[in-house]
Design a protein with these regions (language model features):
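A conserved acidic beta->alpha catalytic loop
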Residues: 25, 37-47, 60, 84
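Acidic helix N-cap motif at the loop->helix transition within catalytic regions
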Residues: 17-20, 42-51, 92
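Flexible helix-coil transition and linker loops at the boundaries of alpha-helical arrays
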Residues: 185-192, 222-234
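Catalytic-site signature of metal-activated, phosphate-bearing donor transferases
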Residues: 66-72, 78-83, 89-219
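Conserved donor nucleotide-binding strand/loop of the catalytic core
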Residues: 31, 45-70, 74
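Short, well-formed alpha-helical segments that are part of the catalytic scaffolds
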Residues: 9-32
């Protein structure tokens, strides 16, 4: 079996303290390194250039997907490994990565790796590892399936590997992400169901009191929307209830907590009632 080739793609900004640590742990496992700088004011770009001549500038437009798509567009290898500067591969997991590179079946289109070290960094996650898609086949071949009434397979072939990426963040990014959510809403963009849930989650993970108050009107409107599912209404009620408590508005507080308690309930509402 021929060993696959891998492009490392990263987007970075002001990562001079940790970029070398990440690159040193993966540089000999990949066949090309592509680094996209989104506006660093420190030595990040200079450090990146000591590892690769494939360093590109990208004007930041408050869109992580746009930046990652730009990085991916520069890749030339069979697979793309997407990494962040605050990630590290241990020696054990470097060996697993190399073994994967040598044995990966050609039909695999996405490889998931475990994201570890969550609890060590003082987050409010109740788990230490979770699978995340990290390695992607650059060019996808469409395959017909079924002997009768044949159809194209749309879902990618995903492999859950035993590789664990150690996450070593220098800071909590919740504040940055919450500000980006507000910008999207202020610009009149409709949040997808996934982003709506992530906005609520980010608030409870690392939002300040002022962030809940700024988000209150948005989530109140979403709770009243007929387009939201039961789970989405619960998420919105959690944010609205906390904001109401912070304002000392007992009527609104019990309006939103009652909506959740009347259903299945949730830990966030129980916590708010405890306050």
């Amino acid at each position: 079996m021929q060993m696959i080739t891998i492009s490392l793609c990263m987007i970075v900004k002001n990562e001079e303290r940790i970029l070398a640590r990440c690159l040193d742990s993966v540089k000999d496992l990949v066949d090309e390194i592509i680094i996209v700088d989104t506006g660093s004011a420190d030595a990040t770009r200079r450090i990146a250039q000591t590892y690769t001549d494939r360093v590109y500038d990208f004007t930041w437009i408050d869109d992580f997907s746009a930046a990652r798509n730009f990085a991916f567009s520069k890749a030339t290898c069979e697979y793309i490994y997407s990494a962040d500067a605050d990630e590290v591969l241990s020696e054990e997991n470097r060996a697993r990565f190399q073994a994967l590179k040598e044995t990966l079946l050609p039909e695999i289109e996405i490889v998931q790796m475990k994201y570890g070290n969550q609890l060590h960094n003082g987050t409010v996650y109740n788990f230490d590892e979770e699978y995340r898609p990290k390695l992607f086949k650059r060019l996808r071949n469409f395959i017909w399936e079924e002997p009768i009434h044949e159809m194209i397979r749309l879902e990618p072939v995903v492999y859950d590997s035993d590789i664990v990426i150690t996450h070593m963040p220098e800071q909590n990014h919740a504040g940055r992400d919450i500000a980006n959510f507000r910008k999207q809403i202020a610009a009149g963009r409709q949040l997808s169901r996934r982003l709506y849930g992530m906005y609520a989650r980010e608030l409870f993970l690392g939002g300040a009191d002022r962030d809940f108050l700024k988000a209150e009107n948005y989530f109140q409107a979403q709770v009243a929307s007929p387009d939201r599912s039961g789970d989405e209404i619960t998420e919105g009620c959690c944010v609205a209830a906390k904001a109401a408590r912070l304002r000392g508005d007992a009527v609104s507080f019990f309006k939103y907590t009652s909506k959740v308690i009347a259903g299945d309930g949730c830990s966030e509402i129980c916590c708010e009632l405890g306050h």
